[in-house]
Amino acid sequence: GIALTFHHHMGTVVQDPDEVERMMANTDPEYVSLLFDTGHFTYCGADPLEMVKKYVNRIKHVHLKDIRPEVVKEVKDNDLSFLEGVRRGAFTVPGDGCIDFDPIFKVYEGYMLVEAEQDPAKANPLEYAIKARKFIREKTGL
């Protein structure tokens, strides 16, 4: 059969710790796993390490994404939409924002993908890919 790996995401029905908790509590671990997104969890004000520790046995994939806290604060202070936050550059690659990835790398050792959700006109994709690659190599040795 097919196992579902659910991606929590801002702007959807499952975005914050309470909603993830409810989903995980009401689904069978044999059939439903979690795609954990560091950026989306931090964006909503949660501690990504806490959630990784809690669900490490059900996480099958991680999106490594960082946030720019000053942009997130501006979005929230002005009651702007999540999409507007993305447009303004709330997200970036690991190592270019405020998330401490070291403890996350120590707890989770499975599949990871770098994701930034940035406007390529504002953040050159190659430049940011190189920046992310360098950061991951320095932090993990991979």
Residue ranges of each PLM-predicted region?
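Basic- and aromatic-lined ligand-binding clefts that recognize polyanionic substrates
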Residues: 1-27
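Catalytic P-loop NTPase motifs of RecA-like helicase/translocase cores
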Residues: 12, 41-42
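Histidine-acidic metal/acid-base catalytic patches
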Residues: 17-33, 42-142
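Active-site glycine-centered loops adjacent to acidic/histidine catalytic or metal-binding residues
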Residues: 37
